[in-house]
Amino acid sequence: MPKATRGVLIECDPSIKALIVNIDSSQHNIILDELDDTHLMIHPSMVEVVKQKLNKMLAENTYNPNEEAAKATGK
Amino acid sequence: VVDQIKLWQLEMDRIRATDGYLFSEFKNFDEYKDVSTYAKELGVLLYENPGKRKFVSTLAGSQQIVEFVKRRNQKHRSSAN
């Protein structure tokens, strides 16, 4: 009998997948199965956690003009 | 700079999340092929990976797939006798 596991299928870019793998690496409580470069099966209760952490990571990687201006005037 | 922000927003938009069931650990490729074909015909197949013998169905389709597997395995057992 094959196994049936309840989860949430995530379809995304390889770069986003790498970020999710990174988020999972500390506790390994998010990813049920790494299906391929652009597909993941994750634990249903962890979808919101992943969404929040991704948003935070992506925001940190976004250019902040105010920060640059502060640096420039500091010189 | 503006282009970069747009790119990130686009990447967030490109993430799709769908509730479902992951079917795995098929006995052999024949079993995988039969069951995934059934799921496809039902229109409940979200994702398939024949190389790994794994596929994902919609939440609603999972029960019918489980019933199909039971029927299939029963048939195979009786034909072996």
UniProtKB/Swiss-Prot annotation, chain A:
Coiled coil: none annotated. Keywords: DNA damage, DNA repair, Nucleus, Transcription, Transcription regulation. It holds the Pfam family Tfb5. Signal peptide: none annotated. The keyword Transcription applies. SUPFAM superfamilies: TFB5-like. SMART domains: Tbf5 (SM01395). It is found in: Nucleus. One of its GO terms (biological process) is transcription initiation at RNA polymerase II promoter. Gene3D superfamilies: TFB5-like. GO terms for cellular component: cytosol; transcription factor TFIIH core complex; transcription factor TFIIH holo complex. InterPro entries: TFB5-like_sf, TFIIH_TTDA/Tfb5. Belongs to the TFB5 family. Component of the 7-subunit TFIIH core complex composed of XPB/SSL2, XPD/RAD3, SSL1, TFB1, TFB2, TFB4 and TFB5, which is active in NER. The core complex associates with the 3-subunit CTD-kinase module TFIIK composed of CCL1, KIN28 and TFB3 to form the 10-subunit holoenzyme (holo-TFIIH) active in transcription. Component of the general transcription and DNA repair factor IIH (TFIIH) core complex, which is involved in general and transcription-coupled nucleotide excision repair (NER) of damaged DNA and, when complexed to TFIIK, in RNA transcription by RNA polymerase II. In NER, TFIIH acts by opening DNA around the lesion to allow the excision of the damaged oligonucleotide and its replacement by a new DNA fragment. In transcription, TFIIH has an essential role in transcription initiation. This is General transcription and DNA repair factor IIH subunit TFB5. It comes from Yarrowia lipolytica (strain CLIB 122 / E 150) (Yeast). The lineage of its organism: Eukaryota, Fungi, Dikarya, Ascomycota, Saccharomycotina.
